[in-house]
Amino acid sequence: MSINAFKHNIPDKTFAKLNTEGEFTRLAVSPGIINKHYTPEQFQKIAEIIGEKGAIKYSTSYSILLSVPTIEVSRTIKELEQVGLFIAQQGSIVSMKACDFCDGDKMEAAAITEILYERLVGIEVPKRLRINMNGCASACYNAVYDDIGLVYQKDSFDVYLGAVPMGRHAQAGELFAKKVPVQFIEQLLQAIITCYQSHSRKDEPFHKYYHRTKSADYWQRLIQ
C-alpha cells in the first residue's frame, strides 16, 4: 500500500473553510463536454490562479472545482477560457455532461450532443436537471444514473428517466423511451423539461417529480 494513500485525509482548505475567511465562489472547470484531457498549460494556469489563496477539488462530474475569491471571478473565468477551459453554468438550470466518445474513436453522436447542449443547457427548471449523454451502448459513463440518461446506438437514443444518483436508495433510471430517432430527440427532451417545469412542486428534484407523476397520462402522450 502506498504510504500516501491515507497520509493526509483532511484537506487544509475547503470551500466551507475558505468562506469563513472571506467570500469565495466555486467554479466547475473542465476541458469541455466531451474532451476529458487537460493540457500542461491548463494545469499551470489553474495552479497560477489558485496559488495559496484558493482550493482545488476533484469532482465526480468530470470537472475540477476551483474555489476562488468572488471579487476575482470575472477575471478568473476569462483567464481560464483563454487556455481553452470550459466553465459550467451553475444554478437551477438544465445541465449536461457526456462521455468521452472513446477518446474520439466513436464520434457519431458528437454533432447531436453539441446541438442539444446549445438548445437545452441553461433553461431554468425547479431544481438542477442533469442530462448525461453516452455515445454508445456500453454506457461506460453511467448515463442511466443521472436525471435524464441518453444512450446512443445506431442513429437513435434510449432515454432513461428518474435515477436516484446517491444515498441508500440509489438506483438507475427507468427506460422511458427506446430507439428515439436522432431527429426527434431534442423535441422529446424539450417536452420532458416542459412537463417538469409545469407539474413539479417547489424545489422538487427531478427523480422525485418523475416517480410521483410517472403514471400521469401526459408521460404516455410524449412517446406515442
Segments (PLM) and residue ranges:
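Alpha-helix boundary/capping residues
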Residues: 80-83, 192, 213
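Membrane-embedded hairpin module used as a gating/binding unit in multi-pass transport
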Residues: 52, 203, 207-224
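Residues that form generic nucleotide/phosphate-binding pockets
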Residues: 49, 79, 119, 188, ...
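Mobile "lid/hinge" segments at catalytic clefts and subdomain interfaces of large enzymes
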Residues: 135, 144-207, 219
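Alpha-helical structural motif
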Residues: 42, 72, 112, 185-188, ...
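N-terminal basic/disordered segments at the start of proteins
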Residues: 1-45
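Short, flexible, solvent-exposed loop/turn segments with mixed acidic/basic and small polar residues
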Residues: 16-23, 52-58, 164-165
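Small-residue-enriched alpha-helical segments and adjacent helix-cap loops
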Residues: 26-27, 31-154
